[in-house]
Curated annotation (Swiss-Prot):
Keywords: Antiport, Cell inner membrane, Cell membrane, Ion transport, Membrane, Sodium, Sodium transport, Transmembrane, Transmembrane helix, Transport
NCBIfam families: NhaA, PRK09560.1, PRK09561.1
Family the UniProt entry places it in: Belongs to the NhaA Na(+)/H(+) (TC 2.A.33) antiporter family.
Record HAMAP family: NhaA (MF_01844)
Record's protein name: Na(+)/H(+) antiporter NhaA
Length: 400
């Protein structure tokens, strides 16, 4: 009898887990859970074990070629490159077939995204300008964590109009493109010509695979792995390899099959339920030891939090409103400016993407206090943006 009861409970638990992973908000919930676990571990008696685990040396060697990095660097440089493969595929799909495929569709979220990148950077600079050592952090509040933002929106999915979801997705995709440009231009150092030549050869091979509409995903994975390793060694940030790989996968194969859709379907689950939660677990572990009230007034913390809480909504909403009033763009049918403002506030959730940019802006040499304050600023700004965004979205969609 007890054996049957155990089986029944096991089946019930499995069904609950399956139901959870089918939820639209599952990815966002898992991200939040991973971040909370990381913070609990970082502030518990297990904090040393947590940090030791993240700093485990992991090596990959093939002949004379080797990559030696700590586990956290493998997560940030390796796993996040896989995430950017997905970003590259999503951007390509939207540019050729989706919400960004025509000028009329693309211009409104494009202008909004520009505002959402420029104004947070300006807010950051204005607050942090008195300390030159903080200058590199201007890009941190530019980012939007699309997984979290869509997760919050999914909590109200039944009352959120479809055009508003499309606007948020298009906005986030253009935001990601902006982040890619920023990484390429400002966070690539000490370039190796030899590694860049290997990277160029790998890119040419990917272009040829795309040109001949090769549908075998394993071919892109093998060449993509070579490209990633070459880009990593070149001094250019390795996540850019992910974007190039994503763009190289064809929308349609020779026989009408859709390789990009197939690969996107495979990667989306891995990204939502493994890669991003793992990134959050590795980067959200902020220790509150030694933090006092005076730190709240730190220029770095205030600059990042203000960039996300104030800069994002002001930039996105302000540029959106002006673009319509000046006749540069048209407000999408079915949504209003109050809902645009709610989405603009929601885009202040920088979380994993902001932490990723912070890891590039401030390396280990910047000091523990700088890294801690930057993560605290991101957590504060993202939390406030999530709460306010949810409340504004609930109110504006209910009124509509």
């Amino acid at each position: 009898m007890n054996f049957l009861l155990c089986i029944f409970k096991g089946v019930y638990v499995i069904k609950l887990i399956q139901r959870f992973f089918k939820l639209e908000s599952a990815g966002g919930i898992l991200l939040l859970f991973s971040a909370v676990v990381a913070m609990l571990l970082a502030n518990s008696p297990l904090s040393n074990q947590y940090n030791d685990f993240l700093n485990l040396p992991v090596s990959l060697q093939i002949g004379s070629f080797s990559i030696n990095k700590t586990l956290i660097h493998w997560i940030n440089d390796g796993f996040m490159a896989v995430f950017f493969v997905l970003v590259g595929m999503e951007v390509k799909k939207e540019l050729f077939e989706g919400a960004l495929s025509t000028y009329q569709q693309a211009i409104f979220p494009a202008i909004a995204a520009i505002g959402g990148m420029v104004i947070p950077a300006v807010v950051y600079w204005f607050i942090a300008k008195q300390d030159p050592s903080l200058a590199n952090g201007w890009a941190i509040p530019m980012a939007t964590d699309i997984a979290f933002a869509l997760g919050i929106m999914a909590l109200l999915s039944k009352q959120v109009p479809l055009p508003l979801k499309i606007f948020l997705l298009a906005l986030a995709i253009i935001d990601d493109l902006g982040a890619i440009v920023v990484i390429a231009l400002f966070f690539s150092h000490g370039l190796s010509v030899q590694a860049l030549i290997f990277s160029a050869v790998a890119i040419i091979v990917l272009i040829l695979l795309n040109r001949f509409k090769v549908s075998a995903l394993c071919a892109y994975m093998v060449v993509g792995a070579i490209l990633w390793a070459s880009v990593l060694k070149s001094g250019v940030h390795a996540t850019l390899a992910g974007v190039i790989i994503g763009f190289s996968i064809p929308l349609k194969g020779k026989k009408g099959e859709r390789p990009l859709d197939d690969f996107e379907h495979i990667l989306s689950s891995w990204s939502s339920f493994v890669i991003l939660p793992l990134f959050a677990f590795a980067n959200a572990g902020v220790s509150f030891a030694g933090i006092d009230v005076n730190m709240i007034s730190s220029p770095l913390l205030l600059a990042i939090a203000s960039g996300l809480i104030i800069g994002k909504p002001v930039g996105i909403f302000g540029f959106s409103y002006l673009s319509v009033k000046l006749g540069l763009a048209k407000l999408p049918d079915g949504i209003n400016f109050k809902q645009i403002f709610a989405v603009a506030v929601l885009c202040g959730i920088g979380f994993t993407m902001s932490m990723f940019l912070a890891s590039l802006a401030f390396d280990a040499n910047a000091g523990e206090s700088v890294n801690t304050l930057s993560r605290l600023g991101i957590l504060l700004g993202s939390t406030v943006s999530a709460i306010l965004g949810y409340l504004f979205l609930k109110q504006t969609t209910k009124l509509s």
